[in-house]
């Protein structure tokens, strides 16, 4: 970084933003408190840019990437910093907004910070919609649990089939009658909550279909759907959460981004590895582990998988087939060694991530 560059670090919150300005040759930044609206921050930065070159940074947080995009639109360099990778002093027990902004400016000039990838507007919109679906799915699960627990407390058990939440189960729920008005109202409220969540989920699923035609997702989804256990929804989630796979130099770097690499505490002659780090993208890790369960079965090209692979690039199809053979063999070897199924599937998901990266970067 040039010695003549002015560093501006922001500690951004909903109402106020602290700006730490570190001028060339100075060791202590000047601190300014601003309102968090973009026009105010832009005017502040433009005033400093008239004097010399500036570079900005701030921690990734709930305020998102709007400030970065507003600065980039005016040709002002701005990095969004990964909070988990900011160096911390073990004995530092004082934390304030002004202190955080000042430390961020000093560390940024020393090039001791790690910037994160900024998704495009389309990638962020797709990611938000997919995460919205996850939230609705969790709401539906909670609503169903509340209804099931209410019925169980009052001795109401569905025994017509072994599966719940089918049409027959819905008819059985509607046929329930209660001796007291309060119980009747409770039952209706719980059923209505389930129906509303189902309706919201179906509406979002319709919106997700439109994403399959919006660039740059279709090309990525086409390659991802060549793999066993990955259909439209899973492929969309991976494509949106991962972004452009070419930004990762190696397959292990993608595995680390998903939090699927093992933790390690080694020193000298001692080598100790522990559970996976879980420090990466939890949404991506979840769908990868779900897809990895499919590789406990023998390698096979079923009709649905053949349909998904139709028209896909031949290199992606070839990588997907090699993944099937390799990952099933890996599953069986680990199972023969007596490993727990959850550990096996996690290991398979880690290797599956490498195959997906290879298919996306061909």
Segments (PLM) and residue ranges:
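A detector of single, family-specific signature residues
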Residues: 1-362
């Amino acid at each position: 970084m040039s010695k003549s560059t002015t560093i501006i670090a922001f500690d951004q919150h909903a109402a106020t933003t602290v700006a730490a300005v570190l001028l060339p040759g100075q060791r202590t930044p000047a601190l300014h408190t601003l309102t968090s609206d973009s026009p105010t921050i832009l005017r502040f930065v433009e005033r400093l840019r008239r004097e010399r070159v500036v570079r900005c940074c701030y921690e990734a947080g709930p305020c998102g990437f709007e400030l970065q995009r507003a600065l980039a639109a005016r040709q002002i360099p701005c990095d969004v910093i990964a909070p988990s990778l900011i160096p911390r002093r073990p004995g530092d027990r004082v934390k304030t907004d002004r202190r955080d902004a000042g430390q961020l400016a000093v560390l940024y000039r020393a090039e001791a910070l790690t910037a994160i990838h900024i998704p495009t507007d389309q990638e962020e919109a797709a990611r938000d919609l997919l995460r919205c679906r996850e939230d609705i799915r969790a709401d539906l699960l909670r609503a169903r649990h509340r209804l099931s627990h209410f019925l169980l407390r009052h001795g109401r058990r569905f025994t017509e089939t072994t599966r719940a939440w089918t049409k027959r189960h819905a008819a059985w729920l509607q046929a329930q009658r209660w001796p007291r008005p309060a119980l009747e109202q409770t039952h209706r409220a719980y059923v209505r909550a389930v129906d509303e969540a189902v309706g919201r989920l179906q509406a979002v699923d319709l919106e997700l279909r439109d994403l399959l035609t919006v660039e740059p997702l279709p090309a990525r989804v086409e390659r991802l759907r060549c793999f066993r256990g990955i259909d439209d929804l899973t492929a969309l989630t991976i494509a949106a959460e991962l972004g452009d796979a070419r930004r990762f130099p190696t397959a292990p770097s993608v595995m680390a981004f998903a939090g699927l690499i093992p933790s390690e505490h080694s020193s000298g002659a001692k080598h100790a590895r522990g559970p996976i780090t879980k420090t990466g993208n939890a949404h991506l890790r979840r769908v990868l582990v779900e897809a990895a369960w499919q590789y406990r079965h023998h390698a096979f090209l079923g009709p649905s998988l053949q349909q998904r692979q139709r028209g896909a690039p031949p290199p992606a199809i070839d990588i997907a087939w090699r993944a099937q053979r390799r990952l099933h063999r890996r599953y069986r070897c680990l199972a023969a060694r007596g490993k727990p199924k959850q550990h096996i599937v996690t290991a398979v998901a880690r290797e599956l991530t490498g195959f997906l990266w290879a298919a996306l970067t061909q």
